[in-house]
Amino acid sequence: MSTSPAARPTSNAHLLGWVDEMAKLCKPDRVYWCDGSEAEKKRLTDDAVAAKVLIPLDQQKWPGCHYHHSNSSDVARVEHLTFICTPTKEQAGPTNNWMEPKEAYRKLGAIFDGSMKGRTMYVVPYVMGPSTSPFAKVGIEITDSVYVALNMGIMARMGKVALDRLGDSDEFNRGLHSVADCNPERRFICHFPQDNTIWSVGSGYGGNALLGKKCLALRIASYLAKNEGWLAEHMLILEAESPTGEKQYVAAAFPSACGKTNFAMMIPPAAFPGWKIRTVGDDISWMRVGEDGRLWAVNPENGYFGVAPGTNRKTNPNAMDSVRKDTIFTNVARTPDGDIWWEGMDHEAPAELIDWKGQPWKKGSTEKAAHPNSRFTAPAKNNPAISPLVDDPKGVPISAIIFGGRRSTTVPLVLEAFNWTHGVYLGSTMGSETTAAATGQVGVVRRDPMAMLPFIGYDCGSYLQHWLDMQSRIPNPPKIFLVNWFRKSAEGKFLWPGYGDNMRVLKWMLDRAAGRAPAKETLLGYTPGDSGLDLHGLDVSKDAIAAATQIDLGEWEQELESQSEWFEKLGKTLPRPLALQRELLLERVRAARKVK
């Protein structure tokens, strides 16, 4: 194994000792410390191209862009192989897979043993959050994947900046990753919250291998946030500027493939001249209480790891601009001359493609050319609508928190919670139909509290209690809303146009947060009523709007029955105030049905 003293760019004894220990376990041929420089990026990219890990795209059309296709069994997060390794099973809770920490270290240690023979061990220091922010957390990821090292260079503030922030401290996340033999039978993603450690083996896929993303920024961070009195959430952060120059900020939690990136990069419709939406973040929000008693948020990431299929100039022009240069595309389809394509792109598929498995594909094939969970990794700075406050160490003040799932029935277009506790109840009972972003059945409704079900690093009931406890810490809390862009007619057609027209719902929420919009009180919460939404210039029938905003009492009685099953699953740590909210709503629904 080769590494020279000059190649060790730190004197931090805690870090050096840990890296040596991991090298002894994994037995790489050489150890390389990443510095995050442009020169290094070029060198590692050249190495990846030489090793056929990356394929350069047409540099005229896609400057600085490359293509990667993963092992065909390694295309999504694997929730059944993702473990929370706490001292007791109760600390992990009923919604997480649990493994006893010593057993996990032993089991994975046997797979890591010698897993990097013949390979380079990359030491990837990174900071989540603006590097000078009190929010920031340092992580070190050790990996044998140059693809992972290059992706981390896009997704986080990577290299020297992280070592400078760390100094001589022992407070850093210890992340060990190896693709090993990419065997699904030997694939594990283990989180050790008490040790601030992540071990991931057997997968090169983003959510399993880019350890700063879901693993640190959500699973480990949610545990740290509970202990330290803040929130680590699966939320976009957007900036809305009105024609008068007023800026407001919202955080919104949607499960994977429910339009989070599209909402964060929304372009307001022509009927809203002068409005501007800018992106602070598209996926993760870390929120702390500021000196002014408001909730302030930063985006811990530095790039976008977005779903490609369905992204086009109509649905998300800012995302299309964000991927035009210096982007890594994974598991989309490509042409032999270095162009790319995916389902839902602006133009039809070319006559012939190379599909995501590397096989020839002809137009008219019943197989998907791009994998449904194919991705782009793009630098945030590419986004033409990025907020100038994206690197502000203070973060941005949050006026509204929005929860939203993908429901074809039951949940109306928008609701405002009566109060914080009611808002936590709405978030805790969110449901969404499953997507391709996690392996498993597609189209089944599952409860996904705050869109965090796969990402809570400890017991779910305790997590919901932490949300309730935050109320006493936030003197000036944001308002909480529930939205549903995906309601369908009896014929299966979407009732609401979505995309840029979601601005109409956002404007009402912003006006409510500022205390200047009327609302109608219903048994579910406050709604815009018949005249609250600005619908001018919208080509949608009154009947469709009425159906999208309707509250069907029969559906809600069924919904509350289903919520009861969900709450029973959470067991004895379910906060009593949330059970009470369900009981009170059930009484209101039954009373209203009797009146009818």
From Swiss-Prot:
Q: Name one GO cellular component term.
A: cytosol
Coarse class of the protein's main subcellular location: cytoplasm
Cellular compartments annotated:
Cytoplasm
What UniProt keywords apply to this chain's record, in alphabetical order? Cytoplasm, Decarboxylase, Gluconeogenesis, GTP-binding, Lyase, Manganese, Metal-binding, Nucleotide-binding
Q: Where does substrate bind?
A: 77, 205-207, 256, 373-375
> Which terms does the UniProt entry file under GO BP?
cellular response to glucose stimulus; gluconeogenesis; glycerol biosynthetic process from pyruvate; oxaloacetate metabolic process; propionate catabolic process; response to lipid; response to starvation
- Annotated residues that bind Mn(2+) are located at 214, 234, 283
Q: Which CDD domains match?
A: PEPCK_GTP
Which parts of the sequence are annotated with region: Disordered? Answer: 362-388
A Pfam family that the UniProt record links to this protein: PEPCK_N
Q: Where is the active site?
A: 258
Quick check: keyword Cytoplasm in the entry? yes
Q: Which reaction does it catalyse?
A: oxaloacetate + GTP = phosphoenolpyruvate + GDP + CO2
E.C. number(s) listed in UniProt: 4.1.1.32
Q: Does the keyword Metal-binding apply?
A: yes
Q: Which cofactor does it need?
A: Mn(2+)
UniProt cofactor note: Binds 1 Mn(2+) ion per subunit.
Q: What does this protein do?
A: Catalyzes the conversion of oxaloacetate (OAA) to phosphoenolpyruvate (PEP), the rate-limiting step in the metabolic pathway that produces glucose from lactate and other precursors derived from the citric acid cycle.
Q: Quaternary structure per UniProt?
A: Monomer.
Q: What is this protein called?
A: Phosphoenolpyruvate carboxykinase [GTP]
Natural source organism: Anaeromyxobacter dehalogenans (strain 2CP-1 / ATCC BAA-258)
Q: What is the lineage of its organism?
A: Bacteria, Pseudomonadati, Myxococcota, Myxococcia, Myxococcales
Gene encoding the protein: pckG
